[in-house]
């Protein structure tokens, strides 16, 4: 059965979110593995991230966030972990999942080993989630979470530091 046939956001339950949290930790470990290579090859960032940063400089922060956090993960996951493996490669889904994983990596434009590790590793983890649990919603949710953390991390850090600021500066903001 295709993941598109039984698409249902109600499957995102607390146990599913807990499982996705473990996969999120695995994705972060993948990023830690890729970072030394990226640092050596490209100053610590990917060409894809540089392009997103450039686009961000010309787009409203919230609108860009909606695209990065909602639109891109839904479209990428549906294409790479549902349409390619289950429709285009119907009857040969394992090969289709691998093809989808490679296509996802290709979409992010890797040109160095560090970028291949970063995006290829992320793609394999997201693919495993979709393949193992036969629920595209899980990989979409995981992808959205990862992008949200990456996109809004400065805001999250500031919010976390706000209580510390108040302690040291006695509520004088």
Labelled PLM ranges:
Residues 20, 28-31, 61-173:
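Transmembrane helix-loop-helix hairpins at the membrane interface
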Residues 39-58:
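Membrane-interface interhelical connector segments
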Residues 1-21, 41-44, 84, 134-137:
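Membrane-helix interface linkers and caps
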